[in-house]
Regions:
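Predominantly flavin-linked oxidoreductase catalytic cores and closely associated redox partners
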Residues: 4-157, 215
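Solvent-exposed, non-transmembrane amphipathic alpha-helical segments
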Residues: 19, 65-66, 75, 92, ...
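Context-gated lysine
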Residues: 21, 57, 64-67, 79, ...
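Flavin (FAD/FMN)-binding glycine-rich loop and adjacent Rossmann-like elements that form
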Residues: 77-122, 128-133, 185, 241, ...
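FAD/FMN-dependent oxidoreductases across multiple families
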Residues: 110-112, 118, 122, 134-260
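C-terminal helical "tail/cap" subdomain of flavin- and related membrane-associated enzymes
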Residues: 221-416
């Protein structure tokens, strides 16, 4: 049943003008389209107001800002045919044309990436995200500046846009967008979700993931309240879970854009990041066990070590990008039809698990990640794992030789 069918009242064309904390109820003041002022009492107030950040402003919640990238974007009236950007027959045949038409496509280079996103109505969103350490952000103050930047860094795409002469529907820019409110879930019965509470980075498009995580945690907290339980400890636990995911994503993107020009290392990073995302908390979430404290306790060591291993590997990728010479990788590395470690982790997301099976799957996934990390060191640096940054984190793992073979095949087309 929909929320409306369950008796939820939806007030359309209204604007919240004030929220006052109270016990047992908060007071919410809002105005309607006609200008009338109304008040209502609410035991819980949940802020999904996005960039308006109503509760952060009303309750003066401090926000922590991290090193941030800069973005500019615009929409054009028309469909961009990504296949028209190349005449390379091998590249054109790599995936069906419709796949590129329906998907987000990325163009990447040192310190930046460009998105091409098909929208409804045959419109297209085009965006540029840069690390200010590599690109002067004032270039993106205007649409003309962004076009000039594209001409320099993505001349093939810039020439394509020029030849099509699309009508530009709008232009936006944003910097300093990485932040997290210092309080997201309160025992005073208010909570923040979506970008009203935090935002990481657009790379990997994690926004809806964090919305889903926050909403799941909020529903758990409301359930605790309805059951008559105190909220201090559950709120603290929810905060810790959310922040762990947030900080993990920050480590994935912060100071990482410089890697993009190194084909070998960014390929390794993409394979690692995807496999990691599907191996632990993501697997538990897809099995509706994200807030199951019993299962969380049984895999707590694995989840903790996954997080530490991931953070360490991000440091390793940065080091490799400056110390390891680039070399060609196979052109169809990501769009690969060979069964491999990443695909197995992804398939497990949609496989129903009993509690015991889920615990065992998380443990197997951690061992596979250890095997992947060790295989990366062997393949990229030819370095003894005992002399590496990850030696302690992978201690006691059981090596899976098939992971090493699959990695070699994915990167170089050589499974030996």
């Amino acid at each position: 049943a929909t929320l409306l069918e369950q008796g939820v009242e939806f007030i359309d064309s209204a604007r919240v003008t004030n929220v006052e904390k109270g016990d047992p109820c908060h007071t919410v003041t809002y105005s309607t389209a006609s200008g009338e002022q109304h008040e209502l009492d609410a035991r819980w107030v949940l802020d999904a107001s996005g960039g308006a950040r109503l509760l952060q402003k009303a309750f003066n919640i401090p926000a922590k800002h991290s090193k941030s990238h800069h973005s500019s974007w615009f929409r054009v009236a028309g469909k961009i045919e990504v296949n028209d950007l190349s005449s390379d027959e091998e590249w054109l045949q790599k995936v069906p044309e419709v796949a590129r038409q329906l998907c987000t496509n990325h163009l990447i280079g040192k310190g930046y990436w460009v998105w091409i996103i098909p929208l409804s109505g045959n419109n297209t969103s085009i965006g540029v995200v840069v690390d200010p350490a590599h690109h002067e952000v004032s270039q993106f103050d205007t649409l003309e500046g962004t076009h000039a930047w594209l001409t320099k860094h993505e001349p093939q795409f810039a020439q394509y846009l020029l030849s099509k002469d699309y009508d530009v529907l709008d232009y936006k820019k944003m910097g300093n967008f990485t932040y997290r409110c210092e309080k997201l879930f309160s025992p005073e019965r208010w909570a923040l979700t979506g970008i009203s509470g935090s935002f990481t980075d657009p790379f990997y498009s994690p926004g809806t993931d964090f919305i889903a995580i926050a909403n799941t945690l909020i529903c758990k907290l409301i359930g605790e309240d309805l059951a008559g339980n105190t909220l201090t400890e559950p709120c603290n636990a929810a905060e810790q879970m959310y922040i762990a995911g947030y900080e993990s994503l920050i480590s994935t993107v912060e100071n990482q854009y410089g890697i993009f020009e190194n084909n070998l290392i960014i390929s390794c990073k993409l394979l690692w990041d995807g496999t990691l995302a599907w191996s632990g908390a993501g697997l538990m979430f897809c099995n509706n066990k994200f807030t199951d404290s019993k299962i969380a306790m049984e895999v707590s060591d694995e989840l903790m070590l996954m997080g530490k291993l991931h953070t360490t590997m991000q440091q390793v990728f940065r080091r490799w990008s400056t110390q390891i010479n680039d070399r060609p990788v196979r052109k169809d590395i990501i769009v690969d039809r060979l069964d491999n470690f990443g695909q197995r982790a992804q398939r497990a997301l949609v496989t129903p698990h009993t509690d015991e099976e889920l615990v065992n799957q998380v443990k197997r996934n951690f061992n596979s990640l250890c095997s992947l990390a060790v295989s990366l060191f062997k393949l990229i640096e030819n370095k003894s794992i005992l002399d590496s940054e990850i030696a302690l984190l992978v201690a006691g793992y059981q090596h899976e030789p098939e992971v090493e073979t699959e990695l070699n095949e994915l990167l170089f087309g050589n499974g030996n």
